[in-house]
UniProtKB/Swiss-Prot annotation:
Residues 8-142 form the Topo IIA-type catalytic domain. It catalyses: ATP-dependent breakage, passage and rejoining of double-stranded DNA. Component of a topoisomerase 6 complex specifically required for meiotic recombination. Together with MTOPVIB, mediates DNA cleavage that forms the double-strand breaks (DSB) that initiate meiotic recombination. The complex promotes relaxation of negative and positive supercoiled DNA and DNA decatenation through cleavage and ligation cycles. It holds the Pfam family TP6A_N. One of its GO terms (cellular component) is chromosome. Keywords: DNA-binding, Isomerase, Magnesium, Meiosis, Metal-binding, Nucleus, Topoisomerase. It is found in: Nucleus. Mg(2+) binds at residues 189, 241. This is Meiotic recombination protein SPO11-1. InterPro entries: Meiotic_Spo11, Spo11/TopoVI_A, Spo11/TopoVI_A_N, Spo11/TopoVI_A_sf, TOPRIM_Topo6A/Spo11, WH-like_DNA-bd_sf. Heterotetramer of 2 SPO11 (SPO11-1 and/or SPO11-2) and 2 MTOPVIB chains. Interacts with MTOPVIB. May form a heterodimer with SPO11-2. Interacts with PRD1. Does not interact with TOP6B. Disruption phenotype: Plants show a semi-sterile phenotype and a drastic decrease of meiotic recombination, indicating that SPO11-2 and SPO11-3 are not functionally redundant. SPO11-1 and SPO11-2 are both required for double-strand breaks induction. Drastic decrease in chiasma formation at metaphase I associated with an absence of synapsis in prophase, due to the inability to make double-strand breaks (DSB).
Length: 362
């Protein structure tokens, strides 16, 4: 929904919030039950054979809430409570995290997930992104390499120290003056791999930007990556563990998450390439058997479920084939297992050779 709603239009959003809450009050005052319609979005279905429209950003259904049923009454109550907090944030030009909002009324919200759902409902209702509400994520991501930029007046000069980790900015919409001499962006799943590359001075010998979400990526990391893609037009490669969890992280970067399917266009990296680790890498790079772990029953169930996602067959059949191979072999391994013969193997051999292969492929 980026572009539909800039932060500079917060006054317009405030007026729409005021109009909405006023209409709810009028309904209640006149003895009518408020009727709130929330569109439903999804970025995939679990039928690979379906001729579906999951790849579009159009609603896939609609929920209608009234005060006639207790669960719906509670959901409306939570939506309005969070909406009043959002209204205050916008009026005072302040920002808050989802956790901050939860602790404003912990006894009423009961769980963080209640706040998360209410924020999602508000974004859908007002056709905006979370950042338009001045609701920010507590960033976990790190970045290093051939890049410098400003965020809300703060200077981030990664170019001055190529292998030093900088925090991914929280206020991504306020990032400006982006300058880069990089040839590509490398996203790595884990901080341990990020630090390994930093220790090996990877960015000194490879003109790139390295980003990690330190596991499952938060909104700030995904939004920042999307911004860099839009501004720099660089190829993006992703390195994750060869296991179901690593693939889920890869899929979240590339296709977005189901939880935020309503805002998929501002968060996904549609041209991201899977650099590794692939099931076949264990043989190609002679990973010792003691580094190969058996897939658990939970791993197998998760992999089988991921194989049903429509976007794999439609857009990335080769990724689906790799998943099937992992399931057939029944083993998984971490990226670090590739470095069993040499600590610098990832930075000196594996990643550069994979990048060269991607560059030379048609």
């Amino acid at each position: 929904m980026e572009g539909k709603f800039a932060i500079s239009e917060s006054t317009n959003l405030l007026q729409r919030i005021k109009d909405f809450t006023q209409s709810v009050v009028v309904d209640l005052a006149e003895g009518r039950s408020p009727k709130i319609s929330i569109n439903q979005f999804r970025n995939y279905c679990m039928n690979p054979e379906a001729d579906c429209l999951c790849s579009s950003d159009k609603p896939k259904g609609q929920e209608i809430f009234t005060l006639k049923k207790e669960p719906q009454t509670y959901r409306i109550d939570m939506l309005l409570r969070v909406l009043l907090i959002v209204q205050q944030l916008l009026q005072e030009n302040r920002h808050a995290s989802k956790r901050d909002i939860y602790y404003m009324h912990p006894s009423a919200f009961k769980a963080q997930s209640i706040v998360d759902r209410a924020i999602g409902d508000i974004c859908i209702l007002f056709q905006c992104s979370r950042y338009n509400l001045n609701v920010v994520s507590v960033g976990n991501g790190l970045v290093m390499g051939w890049l410098k930029f400003r965020e809300a007046g703060r200077k981030f000069d990664c170019l001055n120290s190529l292998n030093t980790a900088y925090p991914v900015p929280v206020l991504v919409e306020e990032v400006e003056d982006i300058v880069s001499l990089a040839e590509y962006i490398l996203v790595v799943e884990k901080e341990t791999v990020f630090q390994r590359l930093a220790n090996d001075m990877f960015c000194k010998t490879n003109r790139c930007i390295v980003i990690t979400g330190r596991g499952y990526p938060d909104v700030s990391t995904r939004r920042f990556l999307r911004l860099l893609m839009e501004k720099l037009h660089l190829p993006v490669h992703c390195l994750v563990d060869c296991d179901p969890y690593g693939f889920e992280i890869l899929a979240t970067y590339r296709f977005g998450s189901m939880q935020m399917a309503y805002d998929i266009e501002s968060l996904r990296a549609p041209d991201m390439k899977w650099l590794g680790a692939f099931p076949s890498d264990s043989e190609v790079y002679s990973v010792p058997k003691q580094c190969l772990l058996p897939l658990t029953e939970e791993d197998k169930k998760r992999t089988e479920a991921m194989l049903l996602r429509c976007y794999l067959k439609r857009e990335m059949p080769q990724w689906r084939l790799e998943l099937e191979t992992m399931l057939k072999r029944g083993v998984k391994f971490e990226i670090e297992a590739l470095s069993v013969h040499s600590l610098s193997f990832l930075s000196e051999v594996y990643i550069p050779s994979k990048i060269r292969r991607e560059v030379s492929s048609p």
